[in-house]
Amino acid sequence: MTKKRVALIFGGNSSEHDVSKRSAQNFYNAIEATDKYEIIVFAIAQNGFFLDTESSKKILALEDEQPIVDAFMKTVDTSDPLARIHALKSAGDFDIFFPVVHGNLGEDGTLQGLFKLLDKPYVGAPLRGHAVSFDKALTKELLTVNGIRNTKYIVVDPESANNWSWDKIVAELGNIVFVKAANQGSSVGISRVTNAEEYTEALSDSFQYDYKVLIEEAVNGARELEVGVIGNDQPLVSEIGAHTVPNQGSGDGWYDYNNKFVDNSAVHFEIPAQLSPEVTKEVKQMALDAYKVLNLRGEARMDFLLDENNVPYLGEPNTLPGFTNMSLFKRLWDYSDINNAKLVDMLIDYGFEDFAQNKKLSYSFVSLGEEKIGKFN
């Protein structure tokens, strides 16, 4: 039987570029372990250009990236308006895209728009699901309207931020808040704030990454929970995982970029999370409800905060969850008796299924014919 050809795309121009490479390595190994697919790899360099497959293989193997990119760019006609994606032609045709591009391009809907334009199946959520979920403010608005509990928040832009002094923030949200760039991932552009000076610095930092910033109340005594969700119309939910960092209970520590991707030796993981049956049921149901409300397909990770009274708050979705050796999403499915090879096989099947389902939708139109314009007085 002819193997389906899977185009694994990784890298990108976000701060999570290197994280994407590590995730892609694990996904590559998992796809290979199924013995069902031929894998073609495409790296997206930090300058936004797709690289040819041979160059991409070297980068996936963690060879020094910059000389590889420099050599490739010498072969590119940058005057070609399609130069950034021209390398996609280098491997012939393929059957499905498997994006592993965290942050910009991969999780904001950009790549999914390209896949749709090329009329190809792909793994994961559609453009609108990614775009809405990547915007923390839009996500919270949808969650709130649909009755899915999340933390209290304020949204500001560079102009309206002047109306929100630290004293006003404290009165509205409390004396510990998190300031977040609305469209960023993996704790980039996020600050924990406890005073006016930190507040000013945090706004300045977040506005480097987006012109829309979320100011969010802190949860007292928070435990952080993660839940994996996979599937389309009838999604599956994983066991719940929990993680804590030193001083998190007092509010001084939190699960930041360093803890996620650089050094999590001080992080305590718990799978399954030790929760009451009632809280476990509520968290899983909230995850499923949010998955559907946000129009997600294929895969996602839902992050929660559990307060000192064991009340869960949905933090945010991650539409292309990390799959590094440090990623809890990967471990959650292992514990849920779905190993890596089975997981990627299911994700690829979901991609084909969603593509076939969308093909049934009608995009027919009625021809306008000859224009007959009314009279103007």
UniProtKB/Swiss-Prot annotation:
PROSITE patterns: ATP_GRASP, DALA_DALA_LIGASE_1, DALA_DALA_LIGASE_2. InterPro entries: ATP-grasp, ATP_grasp_subdomain_1, D-Ala_lig_Van_CS, D_ala_D_ala, Dala_Dala_lig_C, Dala_Dala_lig_N, PreATP-grasp_dom_sf. It catalyses: 2 D-alanine + ATP = D-alanyl-D-alanine + ADP + phosphate + H(+). It comes from the Bacteria. Its EC number is 6.3.2.4. Residues 140-349 form the ATP-grasp domain. Pathway: Cell wall biogenesis; peptidoglycan biosynthesis. ATP binds at residues 170-225. Binds 2 magnesium or manganese ions per subunit. Mg(2+) 1 binds at residues 303, 316. Mg(2+) 2 binds at residues 316, 318. Cell wall formation. Belongs to the D-alanine--D-alanine ligase family. This is D-alanine--D-alanine ligase.
